[in-house]
């Protein structure tokens, strides 16, 4: 055909190149845009948490052998109305005239009596830090109970009186209001009650 690279000629080589670049010529139908949604507003953390001994805290009683989740001290945790409060940890101290070994573990119970997290043993300062977080919704109160577990032999401690005290609360940036320690009623160790 006598045409060498001539300007304006659209031959087989040009058509092949065009087809490779332009594609097969199929038409893509655009998708229908979705309706925008309103973004969720994050819940602000509350500014204050009030802690106080609950009026229905456990009465003085007995603490026998192989007890699990024996209620000692019920604490009301009340969040300010301006936001939810997450309690990151509570520090409990064994007080009273009992030895630490009266307890095989210390635990927090929620309003239904369900154990929150794993029980902890007392350290050399007679304290246990329970760091399973729980939330108190804005403007509400949760009654949480400090409870104790015992082993199967309390013979060496019979007659001793133990109490569990709330001595510290970590509520993050929220101010904790209330007079600490908060102490419940004494429980008398009994080696014949199981």
Regions picked out by a protein language model, each given a short descriptive name:
Residues 5, 21-194:
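Exposed, polar/acidic Ser/Thr-rich sequence context and nearby capping/turn residues
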């Amino acid at each position: 055909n006598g045409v060498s690279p001539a300007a304006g000629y659209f031959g087989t080589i040009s058509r092949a190149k065009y087809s490779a670049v332009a594609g097969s010529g199929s038409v893509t139908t655009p998708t229908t845009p979705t309706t925008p949604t309103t973004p969720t507003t994050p819940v602000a953390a509350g500014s204050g948490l009030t802690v106080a001994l609950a009026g229905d805290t456990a009465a003085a009683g007995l603490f026998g052998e192989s007890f699990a989740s024996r209620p000692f001290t019920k604490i009301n945790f009340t969040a300010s109305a301006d936001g939810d409060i997450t309690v990151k940890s509570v520090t409990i101290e064994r007080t009273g005239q009992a030895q630490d070994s009266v307890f095989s573990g210390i635990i927090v119970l929620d309003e239904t009596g369900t154990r929150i997290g794993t029980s902890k043993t007392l350290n050399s300062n007679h304290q246990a830090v329970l760091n399973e977080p729980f939330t108190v919704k804005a403007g509400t109160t949760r009654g949480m109970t400090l409870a104790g577990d015992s082993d199967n032999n309390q013979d060496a401690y019979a007659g001793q009186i133990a109490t569990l005290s709330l001595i510290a609360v970590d509520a993050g940036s929220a101010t904790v209001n209330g007079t600490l320690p908060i102490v419940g009623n004494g429980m008398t160790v009994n080696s014949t009650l199981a």
